[in-house]
Structures are given as structure tokens and as C-alpha cells.
Amino acid sequence: MVPFNSAVFDPDNQFHISSALLNRKEIIKTLKNSFSPPAFPLDIMENNLNFNIMNFDTFKAAAIDFFTIEKISLCHPGGSSGYKISSNKKSIVYALDHEFGLDKDIDNSLLKIASNSDVVIWDGMYTMQEIKDKKGWGHSSIEDGVIFHKKSKAKKLFISHHAPERSDKDLDSMSKTMLPKSLR
């Protein structure tokens, strides 16, 4: 969360903010609505000169000397985008807010973009048992992540976006029972 990162308030820091889902004006509006009174105690957008907010294509072009970034549409109510970031022959795929199995074309495109990547960050909000009652909610299961990891031949799988009610103890236990030893 942007305002809970103390580095945001240091004027010597510069932040580049972009989204494949929203244009520059929409990003500014979203940040202003989320992080100003009454939802947040102060308006972080007011006089915040260390935010460089740009459209995705502008960001992609500006970053080319450091890394390449590709976007992919994901399955989530209201829309969602995933990303593949590559640099120095290494790549990471970020695929949160995605409901695996809802749209085979999107799943196949995601599999293609993640193929042989170094890391896949996966939406593991639910278990296969829990997800049965949550069709259309825009999230995946931990088990789907393991299956996707095998198919993509990615080197590592990071499960993220866990159900908020899970404790660290729950996650440790789930890791031991649901993930192959090679992924722990």
C-alpha cells in the first residue's frame, strides 16, 4: 500500500507509478480517492512531487534501458493485468488477481508468457476445496499454482495474495502439506 511505505514521504525518493489497466488520469484519481480524507488522514497526492505517474506505454519505453515489461490481461471482476519483467536473461511473472480455469485463452496466454521464467508469483487466495464456492471472484488456488508451475517449467513459484484470515501458522502448515518439497 502506497501511503504505508515510509519512503513515500522522503522527498529524495522518486516513485514511478503505472498500470496496464488504468491510464495516468485514472491512476491519479484512484490514488486520490483512496489516500485522502475521509478514507486516509492526509492527501498523499497533494504536493507529492516524488510521484512520476505515467501511462503504461510511456513507462515501458522509459524502462527499456533497465528491463522489459510485458502485460497480460487476467480474469478478475473489473479487470486485472499481469506482468512479465525481464532483465539480464532473468524473468519474473506477476499473476495476482487471476482466476485460473475461467478463461482457457487467457490461461494459455499466461502459460506462454510464463514459460521457462525464473519466478512466477501466483494468486493463492484459496484451496481447491474453498474455491468451489467462489467461482467468478477472480482468485486462484494454491493447487492451481503448483499445476501451473509444472506446466510453465518456471524455476520457482511464489504463492501470494493469501486469504486474509490465514495466520502465518496456517500458511506454514499449508506449505508443508500442499507444496512439493522442491517448492518449499
For the regions a protein language model found, what residue spans apply to each?
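Cap/insert and terminal regions of metallo-dependent hydrolase folds
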Residues: 99-183
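Single, functionally critical "micro-switch" positions that shape active/binding sites
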Residues: 75, 96, 160
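Binuclear metal-dependent hydrolase catalytic cores
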Residues: 1-93, 101-104, 110-111, 168-184
